[in-house]
């Protein structure tokens, strides 16, 4: 049974309790599909999907269904058909914590429900200001911090999708080039569900924020020392992968030795990613509808679900 800590806004579930909330949902992914969805350095498997993500997809499905019933009630009241309003989900968390994998898994799992097969995923990386602008403003070393994003464009994008516009475009970002891809975009066309994944998607501001438009949100959490270790491990693996790609922005790291690469990864973590996490990302955790708490093995050990 979930632990209800008196004044806490969350219900706490250990993994054993949470997995039973899957009920009779069948496993809809194959091992190969999970491998293809897995991020660098992660060891997610079919058990993790069955015990963590299937219950989560069931919860979201029920909330989408409730929203659809509310829309039908509005239609009955007005005596006319209401415009289609996508259900919007935010997925937040630190660099290297596994939020991108969580978002991809949710997209695939939610697509398997007959009631909402059209599920789009957009990352906020595409809304980073172009590198040229960041250089002019002197904030290239603060890439990923709130001020490095075109917040207005991101808000306008989600607002347009939520308003039911037929075709809404979002810019595309290349981690290999470390910049937006010129003249390239993704188009979102009235999906049933839109997933928005990014570092700071749960942030608030003095006026309307993207997080105000979310119907549900997930924060992927872990101990700081674990995330640092995962970040360094991922950096070392990228030397043999993305850093060696043609035109790779970080190609100068490709031939670094293990010691030098580890030191550089730790420097980047401690001077950029850790401050961003502590100052801007972690404080938004309290706004999440649900928190996935990972253990040192990169697997979800506990789930916290907001009561209200």
UniProtKB/Swiss-Prot annotation:
It catalyses: (R)-pantothenate + ATP = (R)-4'-phosphopantothenate + ADP + H(+). GO terms for biological process: coenzyme A biosynthetic process. ATP binds at residues 93-100. Its EC number is 2.7.1.33. One of its GO terms (cellular component) is cytoplasm. It comes from the Bacteria. The keyword ATP-binding applies. The gene is coaA. Belongs to the prokaryotic pantothenate kinase family. GO terms for molecular function: ATP binding; pantothenate kinase activity. It is an enzyme of class 2 (transferase). It is found in: Cytoplasm. The lineage of its organism: Bacteria, Bacillati, Actinomycetota, Actinomycetes, Mycobacteriales. SUPFAM superfamilies: P-loop containing nucleoside triphosphate hydrolases. NCBIfam families: panK_bact. PANTHER family: URIDINE KINASE. Transmembrane segments: none annotated. Keywords: ATP-binding, Coenzyme A biosynthesis, Cytoplasm, Kinase, Nucleotide-binding, Transferase. Pathway: Cofactor biosynthesis; coenzyme A biosynthesis; CoA from (R)-pantothenate: step 1/5. Its main location: cytoplasm. This is Pantothenate kinase.
